[in-house]
């Protein structure tokens, strides 16, 4: 939702000669995902990176966002936009985060956190969590 981050992304794409190949959307992520996942013929993605903030109470959002309380809905809606072979990577830096695998049991979830924490932080691995998520085969 931030113009600053959207501008950074556009500049990065331009610098990497990928300008014009991607869409940039400024929206409340929860609203956009709900809208897209409710459409029968919405666009499908081979790869989705989902790295939400731990907490947000942006003026542009209807309600405050809390990753612990909203991650199931967020992951479900994003996963519904995957192609059959698509992969969703979900990550968070919330140190006390607990993934609710029980309510996501229809998805294949692999914890890849150890592979994504830099060696500099190996002594404190709970600074970051990451999962690879796919639809059941």
State what each model feature region is.
Residues 2, 53, 93:
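Anionic group-transfer/hydrolysis microenvironments
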Residues 2-47:
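S-adenosyl-L-methionine
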Residues 5, 26, 30, 46-77:
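Mobile active-site "lid"/loop adjacent to the S-adenosyl-L-methionine
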Residues 18, 82-84:
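Helix-to-beta-strand junctions that scaffold the AdoMet/dcAdoMet cofactor pocket
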Residues 34, 57, 97:
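Conserved protein kinase catalytic core
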Residues 37-38, 60-63, 101-104:
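Short amphipathic alpha-helical segments
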Residues 73, 87-137:
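C-terminal catalytic and target-recognition region of SAM-dependent MTase-like enzymes
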């Amino acid at each position: 939702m931030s113009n600053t981050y959207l501008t950074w992304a556009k500049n990065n794409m331009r610098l990497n000669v990928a300008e014009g190949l991607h869409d940039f959307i400024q929206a409340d992520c929860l609203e956009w995902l709900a809208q897209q996942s409710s459409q029968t013929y919405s666009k499908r993605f081979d790869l989705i990176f989902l790295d939400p903030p731990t907490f947000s109470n942006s003026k542009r959002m209807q309600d405050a966002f809390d990753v612990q309380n909203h991650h199931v809905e967020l992951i479900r809606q994003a996963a519904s936009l995957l192609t059959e072979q698509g992969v969703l990577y979900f990550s968070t830096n919330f140190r006390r985060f607990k993934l609710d695998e029980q309510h996501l049991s229809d998805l294949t979830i692999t914890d890849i956190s150890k592979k994504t924490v830099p060696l500099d932080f190996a002594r404190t691995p709970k600074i970051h969590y990451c999962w690879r998520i796919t639809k059941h085969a």
